Amino acid sequence: LAEVDPALFVALGLNREGESPWCGRLDLGGGNTVGPKRIASLRTMHQAAQRMLKAAKASDKVDAAAWLERSIAFWQAVVLVLSEQWAAPRQHMLCKGIGVYALMSLAGHLVHEAGERPVTVDYFLAKLSDFLDQIDWTNHGPLEGFGGSKGADMALKMILEVRKDIYTRLSQHA
């Protein structure tokens, strides 16, 4: 599976591995919760992992186990930075499709930025702690109404703009 579909390997691993914040949390199907009460499904995470690999400009020959480790580290950092939002998934877009798609794309961007540096929880914390909590992740925040891949692209663009604005302000005061 790791060689045939690395993104599915990552999605399944996020739901299976004990150190993953997603362990046992992905909707594996069978239920019919819809709308803002729904949390991410395995299918959503699979597609989000595909977005991450694309954003990272990963080669065709992907080390799926390494990408699973990076994904777990990323989500561990997200949970530390956005602990209140993570603890209340039904009130926040963080654990729903649009949030998962946008954040996994962001993970890909950050991995690409890292280059040869180690990609660890500390790396992601350093990158995320300056700006991620400045975004309103509530169901009625700026991500409300975003849907599908275009919505995910728009959400990612908004996240990257918030990040750029924060870094611009920080550099002006340095």
Predicted ranges, named:
Residues L1-A174:
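Accessory terminal alpha-helical modules
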